[in-house]
Amino acid sequence: MDNYTVLRVIGQGSFGRALLVLQESSNQTFAMKEIRLLKSDTQTSRKEAVLLAKMKHPNIVAFKESFEAEGYLYIVMEYCDGGDLMQRIKQQKGKLFPEDTILNWFIQICLGVNHIHKRRVLHRDIKSKNVFLTHNGKVKLGDFGSARLLSSPMAFACTYVGTPYYVPPEIWENLPYNNKSDIWSLGCILYELCALKHPFQANSWKNLILKICQGPIHPLPALYSCKLQGLVKQMLKRNPSHRPSATTLLCRGSLAPLVPKCLPPQIIREYGEQILDEIKISTPKNMKKQDSNRVRRALGEANSASMQEEERGRKCSHTELESTGTTPAGNALERAARGNPESGNPQEHGRHTSPASPHRPWWERHGPSSNVEALEKASILTSSFTAEDDRGGSVIKYEENARRQWVREPPEALLSMLKDADLSQAFQTYTIYRPGAEGFLKGPLSEDTASDSVDGDLDSVMLDPERFEPRLDEEDTDFEEDNENPDWVSELKKHVGYGDGPGGQLLGERA
């Protein structure tokens, strides 16, 4: 700390503090994360710094250095002087963002997410509070304290550290999650940018979870285009395999031609080749460009005629994520990076073909009643838990990631535990404690009176069939992570004393 002067505290959480510091040698300001080091988890706490140091991308908060002093780990990062995206949304006070601004920010976030996914990293806590802005228009993804570094592209994720408003359906179902779980959270951010509120609001855990899993999505304001509405719906599909990957979002459909426009020339010159390579999607063998019939045959589409009709009649519920051999964003970036913007025949780069994925299980379409049962009598408050929070940021690398057979909890389990539960500050917390709290689930973007009627009936959340429709694009890549303790619902029961009396703690805050 000898080379740094603390200017002020800019954030605080269960991990410790976030400080604005001045580096005396360079007279530059940086953000410094101060993490308490416990003897039992010192190595684990250091892994966030190791992971962050590996991420070099214009849309990821840059790592400066890390060091230890007096029982603390200090991670020095670039300071984003525009604050976080949550603060920016709240500053609007109901005034909608222009669509061009939303798309510019969203594409930059997607570029950052795509970068970490290409490196087999799951962020696990993507939310508007963890997206940072600069005064010169850059958007950067930060806070990798919950991230996991994977050693294999195909493994199941079993534990989840995140924020309830952004938790995808598969987690409430006690099912494994993968990179598409990050995409769900990304969809929630896009909805917040458009509507200035959370996509799902309720006054009970039961209805919140049911809405997340099967309820309809409240339409975006009429100001925004049909394509933007469809993009949100694609990212909030219940089945993870039906959600587009970050690469698909960037290289196909309406976002593709906008990617070069969201990056200043300096960034394109410095990172153009890297970004171009990251947004490539492998072309199936023997597939000719611009031949839609060959694309359909290569992807195993059973009914070409019906697919053509669906494409012609596509409305707001679908995005333009067709399987094509060319990517507009890639071509534009390559021309800019090579200093030849008028060239129409950019040199082909080698494509990386993803390994064949094992057969994926079919996801049932009913609500996550097991989780709702398990949390029936629990209340939620802002308090931190546990060893995972106390040890600060952590990254765990596994050498073996074998797929497992997953056994679902009985439908009554979580519903029973959540019955009569009160909700408070679920945006920041994931803690279950004994009943006694007042209030309802209220996040920073919640309306003053959160009613279940916002996006569903008070007593019954209607199923939205559109959220169960598969995407047309089947050429996509998923990767997942593994953990030695797969069943978080069982752990939840232990902490809340399910079956042995009233509750206790479950999970802690990830600020």
From Swiss-Prot:
Residue numbers bearing the N-acetylmethionine modification: M1
Tissue: Brain.
Record InterPro entries: Kinase-like_dom_sf (IPR011009), Prot_kinase_dom (IPR000719), Protein_kinase_ATP_BS (IPR017441), Ser/Thr_kinase_AS (IPR008271)
Chief place of localization: cytoplasm
Domain of life: Eukaryota
Biased composition (Acidic residues): 472-485
Compositionally skewed regions (Gly residues) per UniProt: 498-511
Residues with PTM Phosphothreonine: T159, T477
Enzyme class per UniProt: transferase
Necessary cofactors: Mg(2+)
Biological processes, Gene Ontology terms: cell division; establishment of cell polarity; neuron projection morphogenesis; protein phosphorylation; regulation of tubulin deacetylation
Region (Disordered) location: 299-370, 443-511
Biased composition (Basic and acidic residues): 309-321
Keyword Transcription regulation: no
Annotated catalytic residues: D125 (proton acceptor)
MF term (GO), any: protein serine kinase activity
Keyword Cell division attached: yes
Short name of any one Pfam family annotated for the protein: Pkinase
Posttranslational mods: Phosphorylation at Thr-477 regulates its catalytic activity.
Gene Ontology CC terms, in alphabetical order: axon; cytoplasm
Record field: catalytic activity: L-seryl-[protein] + ATP = O-phospho-L-seryl-[protein] + ADP + H(+); L-threonyl-[protein] + ATP = O-phospho-L-threonyl-[protein] + ADP + H(+)
Membership in a protein family: Belongs to the protein kinase superfamily. NEK Ser/Thr protein kinase family. NIMA subfamily.
Subunit field text: Interacts with PXN, PRLR, VAV1 and VAV2 and this interaction is prolactin-dependent.
Function of the molecule: Protein kinase which influences neuronal morphogenesis and polarity through effects on microtubules. Regulates microtubule acetylation in neurons. Contributes to prolactin-mediated phosphorylation of PXN and VAV2.
Name of the protein: Serine/threonine-protein kinase Nek3
UniProt source species: Mus musculus
Gene from which the chain derives: Nek3
